[in-house]
Amino acid sequence: MNPNCARCGKIVYPTEKVNCLDKFWHKACF
């Protein structure tokens, strides 16, 4: 199960995942 982006709310896939502050982000959203 993939997490949702903390900014846009869409699914974050492992290839574009940024983990910060215990949340997941897309590289573009971070």
Curated annotation (Swiss-Prot):
Q: Do the record's keywords include Metal-binding?
A: yes
Q: Which residues carry this modification: N-acetylmethionine?
A: 1
Q: Its domain of life?
A: Eukaryota
Give the subcellular location: Cytoplasm, Cell cortex; Cytoplasm, Cytoskeleton
What does the record give under GO molecular function? actin binding; metal ion binding; monoatomic ion transmembrane transporter activity
Write the record's keywords in alphabetical order, separated by commas: Acetylation, Actin-binding, Cytoplasm, Cytoskeleton, Ion transport, LIM domain, Metal-binding, Phosphoprotein, Repeat, Transport, Zinc
Q: Which residues form the LIM zinc-binding domain?
A: 5-30
Annotated PROSITE patterns: LIM_DOMAIN_2
Cellular component terms per the entry's GO annotation: cortical actin cytoskeleton
Entry-linked InterPro entries? LIM-SH3_domain_protein, Znf_LIM
| Posttranslational modification | Phosphorylated.
A Pfam family annotated for this chain is LIM
According to its UniProt entry, one GO biological process term is: monoatomic ion transport
The answer on whether this UniProt entry bears the keyword Repeat reads: yes
Functional summary from the UniProt entry = Plays an important role in the regulation of dynamic actin-based, cytoskeletal activities. Agonist-dependent changes in LASP1 phosphorylation may also serve to regulate actin-associated ion transport activities, not only in the parietal cell but also in certain other F-actin-rich secretory epithelial cell types.
> What does the annotation say about its assembly with partners?
Interacts with F-actin. Interacts with ANKRD54. Interacts with KBTBD10.
Q: PANTHER family this protein is in? A: LASP, LIM AND SH3 DOMAIN PROTEIN 1
- Name the record gives this protein: LIM and SH3 domain protein 1
Q: Which organism is it from?
A: Sus scrofa (Pig)
Q: Gene that codes for this?
A: LASP1
